[in-house]
Amino acid sequence: GGTTTKYRHHSLERVFAEIDWVAEKKIKYVFNADSNFGMHRRDMDIAKKLVETKKKFNYPEKFRTCWGKNTSEQIFKIASLLNLHDLEKGVTLARQTNSEEALKNVKRDNIKLEAYSELEINFNKLNIPVYAEMIMGLPGETYDSWVDGLTSLIDTSVNNQIFIYQAEIYPNTEMNEPQYKKKHGIKSTRIKLNEIHCSPREQEWLKEYQDIITETACMDVEDWKKRNLFSVLLMVMHS
C-alpha cells in the first residue's frame, strides 16, 4: 500500500460541517475513512463533536473508524467517550498478518502478540468491543503461515471477533507496480465492489469494482480457495 504517502487534513470546520450534515440527513451509520483515527490531538475534538451531535439530534447512531496502529492513551480516552454514548462500533486492533515475511514484503510491522493481548484486556475492562483485522493473500504468506498466524491470534487474545479481508490492489501503490507484481508472482481478479451497510445500488448507478489478489508466488488459486474456506469458517465459529 501507499504507507509512505503524505497526506493533509481537512479543516475542523469542514469536518464539523459534515457531521452536522450527517445529522440533518438522519444517517444512522458513519464509517470514518481515516485509517489512523486517534493518533492526532484534534481527533478528540472530532469525537466530542460526534457525541454532541448525537445528543442533540440522535444521529449518527453508530460511528466506526480504523484506529491508529500504535494504540495510545488518547485512543483509550476517545474509544471510552464514544462507547459511553453508544456510538462505538468496536475498536480495531489491526494486525494484517502474523507472517514476518509478508510484513517485510508490504513494509509493515506489528506490535508483539503479548502487548496486543494486553491492549485487548484493557479495552474489555471498559466493555469496549474489540475486533482484530487480518488481510488474506499478502505476498509471502503461505497457507501454513496463514493458519498458524490465525491460531496464534486466537490463542493469545480475547478479541470479540476477527474480520478477514481480501488483499486488494490499489492505483498509485507499490503493490500495483509491474516489477513488484512480477517479483512476488501477484495476479489479481476484478470483482464487483462488495458493499456493506447500504442499500443495493440502482441499476443506472455507476458500478464500482475491486481488484483482489488471487495468486502469489506462495499461493495458487486452489490455495486461495482453501484459505477462503478456512477463514470463513473461523469467522463464523469465533464470532
Residue ranges and their predicted role:
Residues 26, 54, 127, 157-161, ...:
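A generic secondary-structure signal for well-formed alpha-helical elements
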Residues 40-42, 96, 100-107, 136-144, ...:
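Flexible glycine/acidic-rich beta-alpha junction loops that bind and position SAM and/or redox cofactors
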Residues 65, 150-153, 164:
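Phosphate/diphosphate-binding loops
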Residues 77-80, 139-155, 223:
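Catalytic cores of alpha/beta
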Residues 1-13:
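Canonical Radical SAM [4Fe-4S] cluster-binding loop centered on the CxxxCxxC motif
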Residues 220-239:
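Charge-patterned, long linear interaction tracts outside catalytic cores
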Residues 12-131, 136-138:
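Conserved SAM/AdoMet-binding glycine-rich loop
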Residues 49, 149-150, 179-183:
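Short, hinge-like loop/turn segments at secondary-structure boundaries
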